[in-house]
Amino acid sequence: MPIVKVKPTSAGRRAVVKVVNPDLHKGAPHAALVEKKNSTGGRNHNGHITTRHRGGGHKKHYRLIDFRRNKDGIPAKVERIEYDPNRTAHIALLCYADGERRYIIAPRGVKVGAVLLSGSEAPIKAGNALPIRNIPVGTTIHCVEMQPGKGAQMVRSAGASAMLLAREGVYAQLRLRSGEIRLVHVDCRATVGEVGNEEHSLRKLGKAGATRWRGIRPTVRGTAMNPIDHPHGGGEGRTGEGRVPVSPWGTPAKGFRTRRNKRTDNMIVRRRYSNKG
């Protein structure tokens, strides 16, 4: 996909870098696969802020994505590739031989007109979904299930991929982009290849307003606050933190481990920061 630097006709356009995909569908999404999506503004049911820096932004409709890929043995033709405002990856509209249509995460290199297949008998080709027990070791995969039949939960963002390192018994070892090596049951499904739109990270929004369009509000530095609002706050004039950098609630902000899910600790062979000392 070509990367376009916008002509600097104004200060807000000067730094804009766009990733242009001429193959994207320019019309509306498939109506049967679209649902209403309510914006929370980062608030919970009590109206309290639970996630900071959320609010505003353009209204979105949610596209129903098939993360299970459970229509085995039925060929599906890629009708079109679409933009999805809810994720960094593009999505592909599949039309199955029985007439049903479903959205999937668009894999890298899959074009309009390609025929994809799901199931244990599917060939090893980008976009095909198989149980991990049927995928050769060394294959690059994405959209990986964490529990058989639950649907893909890992490796779904633009340009993401994982490497199938080994299989032993009922578990397979996957190396994720973060460096983490994780065990996954061999009956979990994964899609062959990488996620498309891999140049997403090269774009530049160019101005603060473009971030606001995405529903992201400004982040205020702790040192600019009062001491009642943040541990870094207060002082006369411009001052530093005066301590180890922390969150507004006192949690160390630099390199502190926050993983608390002990139930799945035994599924992690090597943690992502094992080489950081």
Curated annotation (Swiss-Prot):
SMART domains according to UniProt: Ribosomal_L2 (SM01383), Ribosomal_L2_C (SM01382)
rRNA-binding is among the record's keywords: yes
One CC-aspect GO term: large ribosomal subunit
A biological-process GO annotation: cytoplasmic translation
Protein keywords: Ribonucleoprotein, Ribosomal protein, RNA-binding, rRNA-binding
Annotated Basic residues bias: 50-59
Lineage top rank: taxon: Bacteria
Entry annotated with the keyword rRNA-binding: yes
Segments of this protein annotated with the region Disordered: 37-59, 221-265
Record-level Gene Ontology MF annotations: rRNA binding; structural constituent of ribosome; transferase activity
Bias-annotated ranges (Basic and acidic residues): 229-241
InterPro entries: NA-bd_OB-fold, Rib_uL2_dom2, Ribosomal_uL2, Ribosomal_uL2_bac/org-type, Ribosomal_uL2_C, Ribosomal_uL2_CS, Ribosomal_uL2_dom3, Ribosomal_uL2_RNA-bd_dom
Function: One of the primary rRNA binding proteins. Required for association of the 30S and 50S subunits to form the 70S ribosome, for tRNA binding and peptide bond formation. It has been suggested to have peptidyltransferase activity; this is somewhat controversial. Makes several contacts with the 16S rRNA in the 70S ribosome.
Family, similarity comment: Belongs to the universal ribosomal protein uL2 family.
Complexes and interactors: Part of the 50S ribosomal subunit. Forms a bridge to the 30S subunit in the 70S ribosome.
Protein name: Large ribosomal subunit protein uL2
Taxonomic placement: Bacteria, Pseudomonadati, Pseudomonadota, Betaproteobacteria, Neisseriales
